[in-house]
Structure formats: C-alpha cells, structure tokens
C-alpha cells in the first residue's frame, strides 16, 4: 500500500529527562536495552524539538523551524543564526566557522551533492579543527566516514550503494552560536541537550 501519513508529537521539554549516563559513544557494538532507550529518547526529543519530518529513508525540516526549535524548545541562544555560504567571501566564512570552534561551539553544517542530476542535502556537525586547517566532521551514519576534511570539499567516502562517496561541497550553510541561553548554562544535565 502506498500513501503518506502525518502525525504530530507533543513533548514537554521543560520536564523531559535525558539519561546521559546510559548514552554510549558508539552503538556499533553490544548495548543494553536501557542504553538503546536512552539514545532513542534523545533522538526522539531532538527530532520533535526541531520539527523534523521523517520518511522511509530520510528526514527533512525547514531551517526556520529548526532554528525556532533550537531556541524555543532546547534553550539555544537567541543569537543562533542560519547562514548561507554564498553570501560571504571564503575568508569571512572560514573566520566565522573558526570563531565558533575556538569558542567551543559545535556547528550544524549543511551541504549538498549532485547525483544523477539530482541535488541531495545532508546536515552534520563540525566540531573541531586540526593544525592543517581541516575540520572534524561528524557526518552521522554511526560514525561511518567521520573525518577531518577540507571545508571546500567535505567528502565522505563509502556512504552510498556500491561504496560510492559523496562531496557535500554545494549549497553550504551553517547554524552558528549554538550554545545554551544564560539561564540554562547551570541547568541540571539530565534536562539539557
């Protein structure tokens, strides 16, 4: 049967408790039912907070809704901004990205790649910079392909059928200033994302 179903979820973020002690760094090996539930609850809350829409093979969201969700549901700074690379020089873009990383802020990053004439986008996290000027990229995908990469290429190897890699070097954008609002910096860890 084909078709589509949509339903909304309600999450009380003020009282949502995260079981950080049972969230593993890596789920590719064995894990307990409690560890599976802990990470599932976190992913569920993040998706709900940012108004993600899920399909059979992907999830999508509107960037304005994502930013609203980060700020209003997850108490991320009202200074958070969604920026498109095309509006900045390379030097300006690199300086903004480096400023975030020097401040200890992870950066939500978006890139697209072309495959058979179709553009496909992906969002991931940049959370480090090495001495050669390459950025540490967490592409998702259970750690598959995570690496230090050139920001102008952002290639992830072996993630598509047949082991093909992709380069997220088109339509780049990022969310900057992702840090807790001041009133939540000392909030109990179990209630923070």
Placement of each model-derived feature along the sequence:
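Cysteine-nucleophile protease catalytic domains, especially the papain-like/related folds used
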Residues: 1-85
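Short, Φ-rich (hydrophobic/aromatic) sequence segments
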Residues: 36-57, 96-103, 159-174
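Cys-His-centered catalytic/binding microenvironment captured across papain-like cysteine peptidases
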Residues: 102, 116-120, 129-193
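Generic detector of bulky aromatic hydrophobic side chains
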Residues: 32, 36, 43-46, 60, ...
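Active-site-adjacent substructure of cysteine-protease-like catalytic cores
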Residues: 68, 72-138
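Generic detector of intrinsically disordered, low-complexity, polar/charged segments
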Residues: 44, 52, 66, 125, ...
